[in-house]
């Protein structure tokens, strides 16, 4: 049991040193958000010795999220139970290595001290002393947004810890890094259609959830899409979000669907089957929660992903996320963004003035992808796909045909270079995925074992019968 009187927050050495290789999961790309801080947090300071433990506060989440058997929550509950005041403090954590630098601070891999089964967390450390008042408001925005989220494709805020001039946010750790780094490991920095459809579908569901809460993301890009250990995505960095009112609606939608059915006809004594097409009307009930009244004049985001209305400075709403979603699709397919110029200024001019987007690949599925991207990259947000009824309109597009959206979390992540996946064997424990070759060997071993037992039982039964008849014969 940890002695709370020994590891004082005032004695916590924030100068991080590790024998492990300093691996950063933040992309080395020059692309950055327009509201990005020029923060150069050295993390070589110690908390002032004048600080008392009473000034260190912690607000660990008290609600149990949907991941009921998540080992993270098990570790958190164990640590808070052993703590003298029932709260988490910085002294409870051990920093493992530096992961990268975000818009507002630095991120570290850490785990709880004295935990029998150490579980990795990402600790985002923000030095409030080096931030402007506007940047501090971004910190509070991100903390507020994180506290609202409960979704498999979004991070969980396990705790917020304020110590001296530091604010620390404890969230999920994603060992596979970000999607931008993963793209750079692929041939020509691009992905085939199938993985693109997988990642796009999960991002779409995450955006749908945010919009249902009235949250406009405004910073969608591969650098902000992290890959969990099981290969599924997690959006990150919510400091540029803004909230708006949203009124959920539940409507019945009528549409016509063309179907075909075989019909047998007799011609010249033969029996032939012909296809007869007919139209039928279907009524589908849809839930939609799009913040259509959202409005902001702040110019924030990443220049290559900015929507035309945002560049023009005339105000924008949730439609900027659907524009960015179209840019995101294009970059995954082509390895670059469609309006990229030689400079940031040229890129912004291209976004406002260029009407045509170049499409060169002709592989299977590109026709549907091209059509979806063109409908998302409509300069007038009133005509842009998704701006009226949100993600529901995008889900119905042919590019996503065949996806069972309620089961999206159960789809198997793609096999692509640089993606190391792990699967959950049972609740709370994670094990490496079994390779096909090992899987084949396991099945062979199992069948061999069962066959051996079957032969053993048969031999035993024959021997038993022989003994029985031998005994009966003697008795007779």
UniProtKB/Swiss-Prot annotation:
Look up the further comments and give them.
Answer: Over-expression of WAG1 induces a basal-to-apical shift in PIN1, PIN2 and PIN4 localization, resulting in the loss of auxin gradients and strong defects in embryo and seedling roots.
- Name the chemical reaction catalysed here: L-seryl-[protein] + ATP = O-phospho-L-seryl-[protein] + ADP + H(+); L-threonyl-[protein] + ATP = O-phospho-L-threonyl-[protein] + ADP + H(+)
Q: In which tissues is it expressed?
A: Expressed in root tips and lateral root primordia.
Alphabetical UniProt keywords? ATP-binding, Auxin signaling pathway, Cytoplasm, Developmental protein, Growth regulation, Kinase, Nucleotide-binding, Serine/threonine-protein kinase, Transferase
Query: Do you know which PANTHER family this protein is assigned to?
Result: FLIPPASE KINASE 1-RELATED (PTHR45637)
- Any one GO BP annotation for this protein: auxin-activated signaling pathway
Q: What is this protein called?
A: Serine/threonine-protein kinase WAG1
Q: Name one GO molecular function term.
A: protein serine kinase activity
Stated EC number for the protein is 2.7.11.1
Enumerate the InterPro entries for this protein.
Answer: Kinase-like_dom_sf, Prot_kinase_dom, Ser/Thr_kinase_AS
Stretches assigned to the Protein kinase domain: 93-400
